[in-house]
Regions:
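Short, acidic loop-to-helix structural element flanking the phosphoryl-transfer center
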Residues: 2-20, 62-71, 110, 168-182, ...
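Active-site phosphate-binding/coordination module
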Residues: 7-101
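Residue-level signal for inorganic ion chemistry
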Residues: 15, 26, 49, 131, ...
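Phosphate- and divalent-cation-binding pockets in alpha/beta enzyme and binding domains
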Residues: 32-35, 143, 176, 202-203, ...
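Short, structured coil segments at secondary-structure junctions
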Residues: 40-41, 49, 147-152, 206-207, ...
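Short hydrophobic/aromatic-enriched beta-strand-loop microsegments
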Residues: 42-50, 63, 156, 210-214, ...
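Conserved acidic, metal-coordinating active-site core of Asp-based
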Residues: 82-206, 215
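Asp-based, Mg2+/Mn2+-dependent phosphohydrolase catalytic module
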Residues: 206, 210-246
Length: 246
């Protein structure tokens, strides 16, 4: 999210005038793509780390956990008294203690990104509380780690600082890029990927040109053929200019 938001408005206009399209490829669900992000001028998005895609409001594909899979995971988490939330296109749905247990983890995660002072309510301003968590439209379920066995036992897991994501098996950003291209009659040869984290590696390896942010993690930088400047030093805009996008 930080990557694309750092592109200055005039450069966004230049990109569009040159006929290029920009798609957000993120771990976030559709419900987490707030108006200020769409206002950047995105042509579409891949969400849920590859579970969902749309272009100009048209849904291209949407994979979710089945109702039975969701129930099994929710019961697994409740049995262990873990705090969690469901990520759906319709919204984010939290377990009762997610705010209490989530604040310290959010703080740690933000500190690792050079930010401080944010809480669950600030990071997830539209979180939905107090509803049934047995659903058939969840793309991912994220929960807070409290024991080493959590990470080992959780099925379909993708780990980050203090938390684990449980998602649809067999999906990642790379396969989603290919699937989106097939849906919009696009070609891999025309793609450029920008990433900064381990979860971006399949996308970087899929696209014709792959760029890691200088401020990104080691796995992303090792997977990319090109490394641009840090996000906070206009690395994205510099890469756009370098590759003739603006």
């Amino acid at each position: 999210m930080t990557i694309i938001s750092r592109l200055l408005p005039q450069r966004r206009s230049a990109r569009r005038a040159n006929g290029h399209r920009v798609y957000l490829c993120t771990g976030r669900s559709k419900a987490e793509i707030y108006d200020e992000l769409w206002a950047i001028g995105l042509d579409g998005m891949i969400g849920g780390n590859g579970c969902y895609a749309e272009e100009h409001g048209r849904v291209l594909f949407h994979q979710t956990l089945s109702a039975a899979q969701c129930r099994a995971v929710v019961d697994w988490l409740r049995d262990r008294e873990r705090a969690f939330y469901l990520e759906c296109s319709s919204g984010l749905y939290a377990s009762p203690r997610f705010r209490e247990k989530g604040d310290p983890v959010i703080c740690l995660y933000q500190q690792r990104k050079g930010k401080t002072g944010q809480s669950v309510d600030q990071v997830f301003p539209h979180m939905i509380w107090g509803v049934c968590l047995y659903r058939d439209d969840a793309s991912k379920i994220s929960f807070i780690l409290e024991a080493p066995d959590d990470a080992r036992q959780a099925p379909g897991r993708q780990r980050r600082a203090g938390a684990v994501n449980l998602g649809v098996p067999g999906t990642d950003k790379g396969t989603a890029v290919k699937r989106m291209l097939a849906a919009i009659s696009g070609s891999v040869a025309d793609t450029i990927a920008f990433g900064d984290a381990a979860v971006d590696v399949p996308m970087l390896r899929t696209c014709a040109i792959n760029v890691a942010m200088g401020s990104g993690g080691e796995q992303a930088r090792m997977a990319a053929a090109h490394v641009t400047d840090d996000v906070e030093r206009d690395g994205l805009a510099k890469a756009f200019a370098h590759f003739g996008l603006i």
